[in-house]
A protein has these predicted regions:
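Short cysteine clusters
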Residues: 136
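Cys-dependent protein tyrosine phosphatase-like superfamily
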Residues: 1-133, 145-168
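Conserved G/P- and acidic residue-centered "switch" motifs that form tight phosphate/ATP-binding loops
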Residues: 139
Length: 168
């Protein structure tokens, strides 16, 4: 044996397998339902478990409706958008998620005033019991900057805040 497994993952799409691989066993329906219902959108990660998260823009990795349903399953009540193109407020309202927009140009940093304003808003929303997800396009650059800013706002030193946000 060469250390490779010749059996594909259950539920693997046939078009993703090479010609020599056997067909994948279908994932049982209960397992499919559980897998879909037990996680947030792809790339969704908690900074503060159950309170504050980062995520890619809903609809950028998967179907918009699926991503919004996944955010709702995770308990998200407010989506903070950092993209210049606004989210569809009607789609968010349809699943009961509020929306805050604070556009930051892609590959740019927020101004100090904008970062501080967002931190104040996040603190207020958390104090009111909101569960927040912050997003930009990929959920990395602008999202990570705001999440690190929030940690600094809480009193963490900058290096620790950056390292923590990078893990998200």
């Amino acid at each position: 044996l060469n250390g490779n497994c010749t059996v594909p993952t259950p539920g693997a799409e046939p078009e993703t397998l090479d010609d020599e691989s056997p067909a994948s066993a279908p994932l049982p329906e209960p397992a499919r339902r559980y897998a879909k219902q037990s996680s947030g959108p792809r790339g969704f990660l908690w900074l503060r478990n159950g309170v504050l998260a980062g995520t890619p823009r809903p609809g950028i990795v998967a179907d918009l409706d699926d991503d919004l349903e996944a955010l709702k399953r995770m308990g998200v009540t407010t989506l903070v958008s950092l993209t210049q193109t606004p989210m569809d407020s009607a789609a968010l309202a349809a699943v009961g998620i509020g929306h805050v927009s604070s556009p930051i140009p892609d590959m740019a940093a927020p101004t100090i005033e904008q970062a501080a304003g967002l931190c104040r808003q996040i603190v207020t929303m958390i104090g009111a019991g909101e569960v927040i997800a912050v997003h930009c396009r990929a959920g990395l650059g602008r999202t990570g900057t705001i999440l690190a800013s929030y940690l600094i706002w809480e009193g963490r030193d900058a290096l620790d805040a950056l390292e923590t946000a990078r893990r998200v």
